[in-house]
Each structure stands twice: as C-alpha cells, then as structure tokens.
Amino acid sequence: MGRDTIAEIITSIRNADMDRKRVVRIASTHITENIVKLLLREGFFENVRKHRENNKNFFVLTLRHRRNKKRPLRNILKLKRISRPGLRIYYKSQRIPRILGGRGVVIISTSRGIMTDREARLEGIGGEILFYIW
C-alpha cells in the first residue's frame, strides 16, 4: 500500500497551525518540493529550508502568522484534500473552482507541472485538483 505524500503534507501543516507551532518538518520528495515552492510563492510560508538528517532529506517550513489585535500570531489555515488515490478529480480550465471568490488557492497537477488555479486558467489547461488552501 502506497503513501499519500500530499495528504501527509496537508496534515502536518494543519496540525502545526492548530498547535500554534511556527515550524513544520516534512519529508522531501519531488512532488512535495514543487508544492512547497508554490505555497512559498503564494505567501503561506515565511521561509523554507532543506535539511538532511540520517541520509534523509526534509523541508523545514516556517509558517506565516498574521497579527490580530485580540489574539497575536493567529492565522488558522484551512486545507482540504480533493483528489486522492482512490478517487481522482479532474477539471477542464474553464471549470476550475474559485475558493472564497479568488482569495483561496487551488493547487492543480497539470501536464506542465503543479500550479495554482490562476496560472492554469491563464495557460488554458486543466488537470487534477490536489487540494484547496485558504
């Protein structure tokens, strides 16, 4: 039985955010590297470092928290896995959903690599909807 590395990333980030931890450590694979670069570019992480320990590569992610007047350093990320190994979900470029009117991000695996919903619409290509983040 294979591992769902995308679900592991989502779970690690969600658990660290709910625990108010600023740093998350996830295993490094080709797909996780692409997803982490994309989320860093979209502003969900402050910093990403590659770390090697016992011949295994890891990413050390620093979560971005927004300051709030009532509760400092509080920003709960919402992540939802859509396509999974048992049920793949594909959309054409015209049918890609918008999350919170465009404030959220849909991560899509296309024939040209992993990209956001905005990039996929601009290029006019669809693909597998991996997850939502807002």
Curated annotation (Swiss-Prot):
TM segment ranges: none
Pfam families the record matches: Ribosomal_S8
Coiled-coil blocks: none
GO cellular-component term (any): ribonucleoprotein complex
Primary location recorded for the protein, binned into one broad class: plastid
Functional note: One of the primary rRNA binding proteins, it binds directly to 16S rRNA central domain where it helps coordinate assembly of the platform of the 30S subunit.
HAMAP family the UniProt entry points to: Ribosomal_uS8_B
Protein name: Small ribosomal subunit protein uS8c
Organism in which the protein naturally occurs: Cuscuta exaltata
